[in-house]
Each structure stands twice: as C-alpha cells, then as structure tokens.
Amino acid sequence: VCQIVAKFPPSISRMLGGMMIEMIQNADLSILHAIQGTASPALDTFMVGFTTLGEFGALWALLAVSMIASGKHRSYGFAILAAIALVVVFGEIGLKHLIARPRPFLLDPSLATTLIDLPSSYSCPSGHTASSFAAATVLCLAPLAHRWLKPVAVGTACIIGFSRLYLCVHNPTDVLFGAVLGIACGVAAVAIVRKIAEALQNRKAQA
C-alpha cells in the first residue's frame, strides 16, 4: 500500500496518507467505545490493578531482581532489565516523541477515565505493553524449570496491554505496536546477555 501511495504526486500522497491515518484512528476509537460497553465495577478494579502492576515495568523489574538475587537464571534476570531498558530508550524516549500521537481521550473526551490519573505523554507505542511483552519474551526464551510460568507471563502481558485499552489511555494500534516492540526488545536483550555470558566463559577458559 505504501509503495502504491508513493507513486502518486506528493500532494495526493499526503492526502491519501492522511486518509489512511484517519481511517486507522476512527477504527481505534470505535474499538475503544466497544470495549467501554463491557465496563463494570468489578472489571474497573481488575483492570486498574493490572495497569498498576505494569507501571514503569515494576512487576517485571521486581521479578528480574528476585531472579538475580536467587541465583537461578540470573542471566535472564539481567536480560529482563536490559529488555525494559531497551523499551525505555527506543519506545519512551525515541518512538513516542517521533510519532507524537495524541492519547485517545484527547481526540474523544467521552473516553476520559476517572479511574486513574490521565497520562500526559504521547500515546504510541504503549510503554506498559512494550515492557510487559519484553519481559514475557525473555521468560519464554529462558530454560525455566516451571514451564507454566511462560504462558502465565504472556497472559499477564496481554491483560496489562488490554487494561490500557479498557482505561482508554491507548489506542489498539498503540498496544499492538507496543507488543511488537516489546518482543523485539526481549529477543535482542536475550541475544546480548547470551553473547556476554559466552564471552565471559571463553575468558575464564583462557585464563
């Protein structure tokens, strides 16, 4: 689609690009309104709880610290911290300011929630989702003895991402982009940590 749009004169390309962005935004807002139709006091409490767990990647950072402190899968604990750091650098510092997408409640004030403090930063990608999927990806790549922890981590990441939609602080495409970014950061962090561990082992072997 992008190649087709690029073949048009610049003015038409900009117009078509703007139409595509508007279509995506309208679809995002429609999905958010549909999700709002499922709201209930019980879900309010549940979603606020999960979105709080994902704040600043706190849940995953605590898990990483516990892995490092216990000595079990220590390198993967460091990988989780590295993955979250990559999300901060590329997502929060880089892409959010590059894309500069407004929050959905700024485009449609009827979506503004009173359940949490409304964030003032840009919307895309979702940092909660990115850090959660980054950590979950690391755990999926780790040789954990308790394999059930892997689907639990992925499920938790999905719920945290959905909580951002339920609270209408992100668009669906923000959350999708955040998940993709998180997976990429998780894979990259594991690769980096494994390379470092391999280099340290080789150095010890040569000593």
Where are these regions (language model features)?
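Membrane-embedded catalytic cores of phosphoryl/pyrophosphoryl-handling enzymes
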Residues: 112-207
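Alpha-helical membrane-inserting segments
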Residues: 63-66, 86, 90-95, 99, ...
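N-terminal transmembrane-helix/juxtamembrane module of multi-pass inner/ER membrane proteins
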Residues: 11-58, 92-121, 207
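Loop-to-helix transition at the N-terminal end of transmembrane alpha-helices
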Residues: 49-52, 76-85, 176-179
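Interfacial segments of alpha-helical transmembrane regions
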Residues: 63-91, 150
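Membrane-interface elements of multi-pass transporters and channels
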Residues: 38, 42, 69-73, 97-106, ...
